[in-house]
Amino acid sequence: MSSPVASKSVASTAVRPVRVIRLNPADDVVIALDQLMSGTVLDEEAVTVSGLIPPGHKVATRDVGEGEAVHRYGQIMGFASQPIRAGQHVHTHNLAMGEFARDYAFSQGVRATVPSTESATFRGIVREDGRVATRNYIGILTSVNCSATVARAISDYFRRDIHPEALAAFPNVDGVVALTHGSGCAIDSEGDGLAILQRTLGGYACHPNFAGVLVIGLGCETNQISRLLETQGLREHDRLRTFTIQDTGGTTLTIAKGIELVRQMLPDANDVKRETVSASHLTIGLQCGGSDGYSGVTANPVLGAAVDLLVRRGGTAILSETPEIYGAEHLLTRRAVTPQVGQKLVDRIRWWEAYAQRQGAQINNNPSAGNKAGGLTTVLEKSLGGIAKAGSTNLVEVYEYAQPVKARGLVFMDTPGYDPVSATGQVAGGANLICFTTGRGSAYGCAPSPSVKLATNTALWQRQSDDMDLNCGEVLEGSTTIEQLGAVLFQLLLDVASGKRSRSEQHGYGQNEFVPWQISAIM
């Protein structure tokens, strides 16, 4: 996606520049960069604004009849629920979701990915099996919520802000983190819910960003640790230790045992060094949350440009949040390397349609109050902008939630749209870095994989600068292009992968953002 160009006009009521963006010649709307007052004339569109248009919101540039399709990005983003006049605000009061045929055109847009002649590297930690870590944590996982408190007590003992002496001799260890959850029992022992939980825990237990892992249970839970290890092909060893509260003799003894086991792991965990490795060892989870009308104009395409640079150097990017590509999936199926890969994506879309129907929900309920306040109206519009995170390379594989990602290039993982749940699945699949775009303002952070956050607009950057790592609002201001800022972001991702701490890491985020997807009934 090339950089948008802001068309400038002069208002009829005052001599001042009026900034709007037309994203595609076929669009029926332009996007306001500033608040537009009623009576403002958009000269290049030959339109006079009627009513107040907030920044990031849409202005109709032609009359649209009731039931007609309305286009943004050159694609259908919804249908007029009432007649829309040129110059009017286009939003929830006059634009709605609607069904329409999508041409999946499986694999018809596949293009050869030309490897870059310019190498890219970062300073990573090479594990014994050849995988590369971007961070070096000791993790404490729980098989069930019942062991969450003891897990947290063990990790708190090693917190540098509480007991700085505990890790003073181990500067190469990034920390000891407890990743707890609210499930693990009173669910179907043969159901999908337990399988997903075990797949998620298994992915974290063997994640390269962990130098060692404890798995703690209560003892009588449905999610038995022995079965967890068996289903995930894991075995206990010096860097993966398991035990239960019931077998250990209660809370106090369990906490003491956990602290002692972590102490035993620390010397080996600290005995690492970073070395220069290829960017092909990066697997980046792509996220967006608190999206606004600028997300698909700035931060998402900037991330997409960085993804293209990564993929051309042999790296991997994981696009996810299935409800947030809904209605735009045909843009990905065209890029699927085979029709079979494209059909996998369509199958996940159909699963979500059935899942939403069973729950008495509608996928179009996905846009949040914040999304709508920021200018997004339908899930179609949100999806069209969200797909921009994926850049322009081929879609090489589709995975279910938390499955190990083994393919190189752009892949898709089926996840909900809720950011912590989605990112948890990506990290379980092997993501060693997360990149997160936001327009309304997110404070998300992740452990053990660091999260880099991009602001879609300068107002957010200024308002919430201590949570943001890059300001993509510069694209709107014309001081840079999507391609240029994408290159800046790519270097930032390499720097963070090399050990530079992201904003969320500086604030200590990550322990509470581990949220496995729960789809089972709780009995």
Residue ranges and their predicted role:
Residues 2-433, 437-523:
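Metallocofactor- and cofactor-centric catalytic cores in central/energy metabolism, strongly enriched
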